[in-house]
């Protein structure tokens, strides 16, 4: 059996990934497909944490554009990520995968508060840890949350799962036929070229902490496992 390239990973899932083709709401059959792949990876002995977005329910930026106070709109987005985290937890545990949800905003009746050392112990014990609530602060994206949590738990890599996009391109391949795919980049390349991989705060944090990123197509079955095994899929963004 091929030895995995990465042992402790942070998987970044967008909220839209849980919504399927509709792009809105939570679709249990779609979640089950994703979770089945996570289970296969878990059975390899991989320590996995998940950061999930909330864009399938609410986006703080859009709320702000419609006249809401930005901080208030962002807090609503953080609560949306908790709903997604609970949906993931329910499906994972139904498939026999031990799971803990940790939130950056305390809501003890439904999840643990985020405590770094406790999160690390859960990972060591083979539990999948789902980080919800973003960073707990407005104005920060869940991409930044992924970079922050990856640094805090000393993850080997961030797996950036994209919907129907198989890597990083010079432009959006869905609208620009001349867009070219990058096989490998650095976080500095991403920032200097203005590539839409993750926001600049997340890229800077990943660069400063030398955390690599693998950007791949979530919609192709088996890609989470392939990324962890180190197969040549998507785009690898090196830490330095």
Swiss-Prot record:
It is found in: Cytoplasm. GO terms for molecular function: ATP binding; UMP kinase activity. GO terms for biological process: 'de novo' CTP biosynthetic process; UDP biosynthetic process. UMP binds at residues 54, 74, 135-142. ATP binds at residues 12-15, 55, 59, 163, 169, 172. Catalyzes the reversible phosphorylation of UMP to UDP. This is Uridylate kinase. The gene is pyrH.
């Amino acid at each position: 059996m091929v030895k995995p390239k990465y042992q402790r990973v942070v998987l970044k899932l967008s909220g839209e990934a849980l919504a399927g083709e509709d792009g809105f709401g939570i679709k249990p059959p779609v979640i089950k497909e994703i979770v089945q792949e996570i289970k296969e990876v878990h059975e390899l002995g991989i320590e996995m944490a998940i950061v999930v977005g909330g864009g399938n329910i609410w986006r703080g930026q859009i709320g702000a554009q419609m006249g809401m106070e930005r901080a208030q709109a962002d807090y609503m987005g953080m609560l949306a990520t908790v709903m997604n985290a609970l949906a993931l937890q329910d499906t994972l545990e139904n498939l026999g995968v031990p799971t803990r949800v940790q939130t950056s905003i305390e809501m003890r009746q439904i999840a643990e508060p985020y405590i770094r050392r406790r999160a690390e112990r859960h990972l060591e014990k083979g539990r999948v840890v789902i980080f919800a609530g973003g960073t707990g602060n407005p104005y920060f994206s869940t991409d930044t949350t992924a970079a922050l949590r990856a640094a805090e738990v000393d993850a080997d890599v961030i797996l950036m799962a994209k919907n129907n996009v198989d890597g990083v391109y010079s432009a959006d391949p869905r609208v620009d036929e001349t867009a070219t795919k990058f096989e490998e980049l650095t976080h500095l390349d991403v920032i200097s070229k203005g590539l839409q991989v993750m926001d600049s705060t997340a890229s800077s944090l990943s660069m400063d902490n030398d955390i690599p990123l693998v950007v791949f197509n979530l919609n192709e079955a088996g890609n989470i496992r392939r990324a962890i095994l180190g197969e040549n899929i998507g785009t690898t963004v090196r830490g330095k």
